[in-house]
Amino acid sequence: MTAMNYESVKAVESQAAAGVTFRVARMSFGRRVELMRRVRELARQIEFLEAGQGTGDKMDAALLRAEMDRLFLKWGLLAVSGLELDGAEATPESLAEAGPEELFREALAAVRAEIGLNPEERKNC
């Protein structure tokens, strides 16, 4: 009998930039609990602000959604290979701070796909 070999990290090749690979954490029970703890308060604040009528509330909600995107990326993107930013090997943090937005969005989509959010849940997170 052969033992099951489960890889907790998934390699995702970039479609936007040849040679760039994202290493994305696969979902597990423990990681899901950790993520829910991190996201819970931000999600509440976003829901409250989106219910408001003012432009300021909408802008604040958009800012919190961007913060949530950054949180998802830092939680699920473990490494980036094949990309240098300002002469140094890219990291998840440097991709979020100074990398091309197209690659940030692509890495974020890979993380969200691994989280398993459906389209309605993705809209709210």
Question: Which ranges hold each PLM region?
Answer:
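Short acidic, Pro/Gly- and aromatic-enriched capping/linker segments at domain boundaries
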Residues: 1-15
